[in-house]
Regions:
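Transmembrane beta-barrel domains of Gram-negative outer membranes and organellar outer membranes
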Residues: 1-113, 117-206
Length: 206
């Protein structure tokens, strides 16, 4: 609400809704299949990753890794899924010149029989990512990235469909070790991902 007040944007129905309230609910017909309305804390599912560098050179590198997710969290409060998931990933980068770099990644995951919307869960999910980075000058680099992923759930609605997102952004570095990340993402396959997202971050290397 502070953001809306700062830029004099309309507040919609927010003033009539409870403050600091949480409600995650999925209903079909008269049945409520998922409902979380209280905060929770605790141990989440634990991912264990095993990686291997396939190739590496001055021009680029390729690596692969296997990830196993162990169900240490609780499905009831969404800190876990209640199942073991296994994913295989392959990632690479290629330096075309001093200023241009290509990168990409492919992932496929086998999803175990979980406890969160089990009847709607898919058995497999996949994702692809590809992009290019241009070193505009010594302190500034600009990146364009395209990412797509298949649906994890199948509820018959567009909200949980396959997603395709285009991201544009960059990073500015200072001599003192600070780095500023900025960018935005836009959904190319509508309904299954946020319409537009703005990103800004600051970090410092020590």
């Amino acid at each position: 609400e502070g953001w809306h007040d700062l830029f004099s944007l309309p507040n919609g129905s927010r003033d009539r809704l409870p403050r600091d309230a949480l409600l995650i609910e999925y209903r079909t017909g008269a049945s409520t299949l998922l409902r979380v309305d209280d905060e929770s804390s605790g141990l989440a599912d634990l991912p264990l990753a095993f990686g291997y560098q396939l190739t590496v050179s001055e021009q680029g590198a390729v690596a692969t890794w296997l990830t196993i997710k162990v169900p240490a969290g609780k499905a009831a409060d969404l800190t876990g899924s209640g199942a073991v998931d296994v994913a295989l990933s392959l990632a690479g980068e290629r330096h075309l010149s001093e200023r241009w770099q290509l990168f990409g990644q492919a992932n496929v995951a086998w999803l175990g029989d979980g406890d969160v919307l089990a009847d709607q869960q898919q058995d497999f999910a996949g994702s692809l990512l590809a992009g290019a980075t241009w070193n505009a000058w010594q302190r500034l680099e600009l990146t364009a990235q395209l990412e797509a992923n298949t649906a994890v759930l199948d509820t018959g609605t567009d909200l949980d469909g396959d997603a395709v997102v285009l991201s544009l952004g960059g990073r500015y570095r200072t001599d003192s070790g600070w780095a500023c990340d900025f960018g935005f993402s836009e959904d190319l396959q509508i309904d299954a991902s946020p319409d537009i997202v703005f990103v800004f971050g600051v970090r410092r290397a020590f």
